[in-house]
Every structure is written in structure tokens, then in C-alpha cells.
């Protein structure tokens, strides 16, 4: 189960005891559903939900206690595996840059090289070794100082295909293909994270939750997930976000999940299938002929689980997200509850 910074903000408190009680309740809900692993945000916007030497304390949680210490303790007390979820490239909102004072992101702001503004947010540019070194150091301190079971990143790689984002670094590279340049940078980022995680604690696993579309990963995110699955030194598991229905015109679920199964199987790594309850009861406007499937069809999540567990490389499913399961909007709440009950019955 993914527990995002948005979910954590709902239990934000300056009091450690109140935060501990809130996260305990969330974990209890997860355990009752049959969840055995939680993927919890510890860096969402160039910040830290723990005591960090490299990033400032998140604005989303008050107080001076150590949130990560509490979150790991309460997870393990319930037999839940805890994976620290970081967004490596996404930085803070432009309006929040003063919070980075005293840290590298503040020093790099305004230069438009190592930290680049995209819309209302800053993003780190992985073209520079000092940037990937910083990201790796942030991962290493987590695994060295906390009893986390894994480190987990999602699909926030390059935030734009526009050339302005890394034009200076690209022009200095001597390469002719911007795509090849960016793919290589993401390769270096992921391999650096893998090495840093293992250096902090050799038993900690590292995985990537990329987009469900291979085409989008390669051409828009510049994430060569095929290479990461096939070659050692990148990831211990792959967790694609296969947030598609069975009737999706471009990426029908069964076709998509089988493609990922083949990639994972050939690389000898587990496939954890990311599914979502966030679409239940809503139109999926990018699904083509299947745009109404999440409104009209029943037991989609259960059927996705049943299809996934038959795969040779199956390592589990992951559900996005805690809020969409346990705090669904009133307009779809009864539908979500029914669908989750069916999924729970199938899993247990």
C-alpha cells in the first residue's frame, strides 16, 4: 500500500504521540485488508520526513520528533515491511525555496542548471554528478540510520521533454541525441541509488515504480526500464503502475501486465503489479473505448489481482493509494468499499 505525503499530512501534528497514534491507525487498516508492505513517503519535495544531513524537514509535518523512526517502529510492530519512498528529482515549490536555506537546493536555485524551475516547482537535473551524488547520499543515510526494509522511487524522472531543462549540460556533453543523453543520466541516477542503498545496508532492497506504459517511460520519462530489469546493479524489483482497465484501448490490463511479466522474468526479478482504486466510479478519459469501464464494470481490482498472481514473475500487488481506499470521496465510497471487500476476499 502506498502512503503518500498527502495521506501523512492528514495526521500531521506537532505531537509525537498524536502522530504515532495516527500512523498506527493507518497501519491497522492496512493490516486488516491483508497488506504486508507499506511504501511511505520520506521525501516528496526535496525534503525529509526524518533527521537528514542533506534535506530540510518537511513542511507537511510539525514538531521536532523523528517521523521516520516512529513510522518504522509502528510498521514493524504490526509485522508490516516498511519501504522508504522518495521522489529523487522533484524539489520544493518555488514559493518554498527559503525553506532550503543552508542546503544544496537553496545554493543551486536560480542557476537553472542543477536545479531547474518547471512550472511552480523546482526539479533536480540528473545530468550533473553532484546532483546524483546528493540524491544517493540522501538514500544512503536512510538505510544506514533507520531499520527500513527497502527504498522505493516512483515515476518522477524527467519532468519535461523540452530542451531548455538541461540545455547547458547537453551542449557540454558532446552528444548528438538529447534522448540518449537523458537516458544515460537516468541510468546513472538509478544505479547510484542502488549502490547507495546497499552501502547503507546491504540487506535493504531497492525498487522502482515506473509508469505502466513502456513507451511513455522511454520517450517521456527517459527511463530505460528494460535495461534496469535485464542488467544487475539497478533494481531488486520492478513495480509498474498498471492503472489501466481491461478495456483500455491503448494498454489493456492483461496485455500490459504480461509484457511486464516477460521483462521481469527475463531479468530474474520480482514483478509487483501496481493497481489503483483511485479510478473507481470515474471516467478514464485516456482509455479510449474503455473510458467508462471503471463506472460500469464490477470487481476490476479483484480481477486484476487474480490475473496477476498467475504470472511467472509475480511478487505481489501494490495498491495506490491509502487515501483512495480508506478516505474515498463520498460520491464513490460505497463502490470503493464493495470493490475493496472483493479484493480482500480474493487475497485472503
Predicted regions and their residues:
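Hydrophobic faces of well-ordered beta-strands that scaffold small-molecule active sites
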Residues: 1-3, 38-40, 82-86, 151-153, ...
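Substrate-binding cleft of secreted/luminal carbohydrate-active enzymes
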Residues: 232-252, 259-348
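Acidic-and-aromatic substrate-binding clefts and catalytic sites of carbohydrate-active enzymes
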Residues: 9-21, 43-48, 61-62, 212-221, ...
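Aromatic-lined substrate-binding rim segments of carbohydrate-active enzymes
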Residues: 26-27, 44-90, 173-200, 252-253
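Polysaccharide-binding and catalytic clefts of secreted carbohydrate-active enzymes
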Residues: 19, 69, 109-231, 243-244
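Active-site-adjacent "subsite" loops/lids of carbohydrate-active enzymes
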Residues: 1-20, 72, 83-84, 89-145, ...
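Catalytic domains of carbohydrate-active enzymes, especially glycoside hydrolases
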Residues: 21-47, 145-150, 231-238, 308-317
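Short, acidic/polar
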Residues: 9-31, 131-142, 216-233, 253, ...
Amino acid at each position: 500500500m502506498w502512503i503518500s505525503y498527502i495521506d501523512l499530512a492528514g495526521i500531521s501534528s506537532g505531537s509525537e504521540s498524536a502522530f504515532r497514534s495516527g500512523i498506527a491507525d493507518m497501519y491497522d487498516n492496512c493490516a486488516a485488508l491483508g497488506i504486508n508492505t507499506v511504501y511511505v513517503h520520506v521525501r516528496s519535495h526535496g525534503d525529509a520526513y526524518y533527521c537528514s544531513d542533506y534535506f530540510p524537514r518537511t513542511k507537511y509535518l510539525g514538531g521536532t520528533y523523528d517521523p521516520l523512526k516512529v513510522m518504522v517502529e509502528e510498521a514493524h510492530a504490526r509485522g508490516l515491511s516498511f519501504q522508504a519512498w522518495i521522489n529523487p528529482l522533484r524539489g520544493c515549490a518555488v514559493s518554498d525555496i527559503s525553506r532550503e536555506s543552508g542546503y544544496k537546493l537553496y545554493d543551486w536555485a536560480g542557476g537553472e542548471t542543477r536545479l531547474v524551475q518547471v512550472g511552480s516547482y523546482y526539479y533536480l537535473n540528473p545530468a550533473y554528478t553532484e546532483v546524483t551524488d546528493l540524491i544517493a547520499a540522501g538514500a544512503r543515510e536512510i538505510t544506514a540510520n533507520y531499520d527500513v526494509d527497502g527504498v522505493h522511487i516512483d515515476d518522477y524522472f524527467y519532468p519535461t521533454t523540452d530542451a531548455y531543462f538541461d540545455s547547458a549540460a547537453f551542449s557540454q556533453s558532446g552528444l548528438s541525441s538529447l534522448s540518449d543523453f537523458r537516458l544515460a543520466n537516468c541510468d546513472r541516477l538509478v544505479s547510484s541509488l542502488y549502490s547507495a542503498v546497499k552501502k547503507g545496508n546491504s540487506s535493504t532492497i531497492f525498487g522502482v515504480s515506473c509508469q505502466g506504459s513502456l513507451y511513455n517511460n522511454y520517450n517521456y520519462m527517459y527511463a530505460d526500464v528494460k535495461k534496469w530489469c535485464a542488467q544487475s546493479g539497478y533494481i531488486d524489483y520492478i513495480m509498474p503502475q498498471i492503472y489501466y482497465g481491461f478495456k483500455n484501448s491503448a494498454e489493456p490490463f492483461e496485455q500490459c501486465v504480461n509484457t511486464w511479466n516477460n521483462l521481469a522474468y527475463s531479468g530474474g526479478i520480482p514483478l509487483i503489479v501496481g493497481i489503483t482504486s483511485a479510478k473507481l466510479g470515474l471516467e478514464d478519459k485516456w482509455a479510449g473505448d474503455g473510458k467508462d469501464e471503471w463506472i460500469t464494470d464490477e470487481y476490476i481490482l479483484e480481477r486484476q489481482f487474480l490475473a496477476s498472481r498467475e504470472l511467472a514473475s509475480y511478487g505481489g500487488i501494490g495498491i495506490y493509494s491509502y487515501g483512495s481506499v480508506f478516505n474515498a470521496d463520498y460520491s464513490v465510497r460505497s463502490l470503493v468499499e464493495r470493490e475493496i471487500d472483493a479484493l480482500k476476499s480474493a487475497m485472503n
